[in-house]
Amino acid sequence: MPRNVKKNPRDVTKLSGKPLAETIEPSPVLKTLQEGWVTSPDLIEGDLSFTLEVIQNMTVFLLANPNLNSSHLFRADILYDSLGVLSAPHAMEQSRDQGSGGRDQDTQKEDYVEPLPARSVPGFELKRTFVRRLIPRNRNLDRPLEQTCHFYEADELPPTSNSTNIAQSEQCESKAESPRQRFLVIYLPHVSSKEEMPWYHPLLRSLAFLYDFTPNAFPHSSEENKGTGIMSVHFLPYEEEPIQNRLERTLLALLSTHIRLARQTRLDEKPEGGNYNPHKDNVIPKHLVQDTYARLKLKYAADLCQNWVEDTEPTKHVFEDLSITAFLIELWRSMYGVVPADERSPDQKEQGKYDLKFPGFVDVACGNGVLVYVLLSEGYHGWGFDARRRKTWSIFPSSIQERLKEEIYIPKPFADVCTDSEMDFGVKTHTGMFPEHTFIISNHADELTVWTPLMAALSNPASPLPFISIPCCSHSLSGARYRYPPPKPNQKGSVDRPEDQEVEQNPQPAAGDLKALRAAKQKERTDTGAANSMYGSLTAKTVATAEEIGYEVEKTLLRIPSTRNMGVIGGRRRTTQEWTSRVHSAQASQAVGCSAPEAVRAAAQVLEWVAAVVQRECAREGGVEVAAKVWIERAKGLHKGQGKGNQPAH
């Protein structure tokens, strides 16, 4: 199906309709005797309402996110900021407490690139300089490109009037002008000839954006009438290089994208250059996941898609699982200091296929098994299980198939109240008692989503297992479809008890004023996972359940091709601290563990919390025994191939 075409943010009635080559004219700002800078009336858009701060904020945001301008690009890494605000990749890793994990220590040297000199622009003052590295999606087709970006500013006073005619002065009062504010950005690619220019970059020696803003002269202007602005594109072509149709389309698209993004820019909701969503790239820096994903995609995608045997379309599932795998590899690098097989030293490889520092993983409801296959192939030992065997398992090597189990999970609280005959499925069952420190992966596990933190805690109450849960379809603890009520605002970690099922309408803020109410409602609307959707409520329920039984929980938006892309991570920081102590402390057991009596008390507390959650959640269905019977019947259906196959795609 064709992609939805975004509405053009420009006033197309003012465009000439002629080819760009017929409308170019010298740039009044940048043209010199030595450099033939040009622009065009078709590359100018007026009557814009954006303040200078909005344009500057949007421009800085685009520095690290050029993928919004070109689908050929992943991102840009900021290598240099003259103000020291935006960080280079190695600095971002250090700020997130990333372990070196076997990374090349020369990375910091590679991140430094000398900026190209800034040209003098009459009337403008150089304010800031960046160097960025454009990262293509497919490095087999295109190479990364460094680019220097210079920011200039200028203030111009309006022309003075010598008229002493008071009546004329009063008549023109409504047209009074303030000093014009000007913001100029010049982009310089680090190439010595046009032959070195990658495909994704316009074939230009240099590119510039100019924004002129004239504030409203009256101080009490409304928010919508702060002034008017003009945005224009200027460029320095190569000599004797014709203006091709592709370049024309690119320049027009760049101008449209800048206008569209400026309309979406909010000055008070994000740090400079950062994401609007606080849950995006908040656990692992974007560049680490994207680089690993690109490597995995090149290594596995073609073979998996070519040999796909399921009835579903392969690319979506393959790319999604590779994206999640990339995130897990970088997550485990930061938690355990382990690296994929290709990065291990010869001494490490001699010790075996798997890194023994890694405690192992289990992929619950593993489905097609792609995630397990790639993780095992990358040198991380673990296994996966599902209620029924999938056709895809047959395409994997026998060593991988041995790690994919057709087993049914029966939660321990349910197994404790069921008879042996009720537990007889004709297939192996288990209660989720995994080895100590196992990392649990719950990827779109549906019935197991809310059970995931409970399963992790029950497996080792003295030291609950770390986990990641990526919610999808909403189910109660019995496995029946159930839509959880949205969480109450301003109650972090609260859970919906039976007596609290009714959600309060129009809650009042504690501060008691309209400003506080507006802020509370805005936060409620924008806080991912607190939305009133079924998915948002399920995510919030998973978080609340984990927090209630003692987990420190983090939410992060995963870069996967799915709308169900929220990752709920439990126990990451605690596990990272424990593993760091194990590696660096000569008295690891004393440094990491606690005394036996303390461990017993901690385990008893966790079990008490879990029991309270299970009893409360099952109460709506008649109690734990009734919920257990529902779970058993649904599990039998899943084993026969019913249920999940009829669920909508996500």
UniProtKB/Swiss-Prot annotation:
Enzyme Commission number: 2.1.1.211
Q: Where in the cell is it found?
A: Cytoplasm
What Gene Ontology molecular function terms does this protein carry?
Answer: tRNA (uridine) methyltransferase activity; tRNA(Ser) (uridine(44)-2'-O-)-methyltransferase activity
* Statement: the UniProt record of this protein carries the keyword Coiled coil: no
EC supergroup of this enzyme:
transferase
Write the protein's name.
tRNA (uracil-O(2)-)-methyltransferase
Lineage, please? Eukaryota, Fungi, Dikarya, Ascomycota, Pezizomycotina
The keyword Methyltransferase is assigned to this record:
yes
Q: Biased composition, Basic and acidic residues: where in the chain?
A: 103-112
Query: One Pfam family name from the record?
Result: AdoMet_MTase
**Organism for this UniProt entry:** Aspergillus fumigatus (strain ATCC MYA-4609 / CBS 101355 / FGSC A1100 / Af293) (Neosartorya fumigata)
